Amino acid sequence: MSYIVIEGTTVRFLTTTPFTAFNGTVVNPDVVTFSYEVQGQNPVTYTWTNPTGDPTNTIVNNATGYFYADIDTGGGAGVWSWRWASEASTGIDTTGTTVACEGSITVSPSGVV
């Protein structure tokens, strides 16, 4: 999905479908990452690790298999590309998911001075 928001808006990026194991069971993977990149800038990545979570509290696990991150768009006018992904890190994690969802938003500078 692609949206246009005004710079300075806090945007909630969320997984719209859950992370699932190969057998279809909804699971929390061992490691979940949320990454975004504003055109022309370095990518920013946050990591959530099961069971300790995200030390920055940016990624929130709000239900089994579902996650969200609230990101302030201040100072970031341009096209943002974002991605939710996971990597199996133990034999217990059978998700095998590499990308759960991805998309882009356009952050428009505010016209108010």
Give short role names for the model-derived ranges.
Residues M1-V113:
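Polar, enzyme-active/binding microenvironments
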